[in-house]
Amino acid sequence: MSQPCPCGSADEYSLCCGRIVSGERVAPDPSHLMRSRYCAFVMKDADYLIKSWHPTCNAAAFRDDIIAGFANTRWLGLTIFEHTWSEAENTGYVSFIARFSEQGKNGAIIERSRFIKENGQWYYIDGTRPQLGRNDPCPCGSGKKFKKCCGQ
């Protein structure tokens, strides 16, 4: 039986992000790279995570930390609520919420990730995390307060 893609699409993993993670195809844009990186966290694929970071980030130096992070984390879902990129400038941004459970406590990573394209390949560079108050609107666009939505 086929496995659904953890990125949240309705497609099978092998027909969706699995093709990017395996190297069968390159991510056509930053949003697809973000989705494939989320899948790599779910599948505990440190090699792909390192490969998809820009080489100047020296992610291989953090391999042990990446692998240690897999131990107690269960990923619960990804919501991308904004993505923009410029082929002319070879830069892109993806804003997302990645939900997880770690040692029985639920949490979320809310980030605006920055990507760069070099030699036809998109790479993750870094990200910024907004400072949200409990009564701020949730960045996912639900219209709810952060504390009643993704901040739970």
UniProtKB/Swiss-Prot annotation:
InterPro entries: NTF2-like_dom_sf, SEC_C_motif, UPF0225, YchJ-like_M. Pfam families: SEC-C, YchJ_M-like. Belongs to the UPF0225 family. This is UPF0225 protein YchJ. The gene is ychJ.
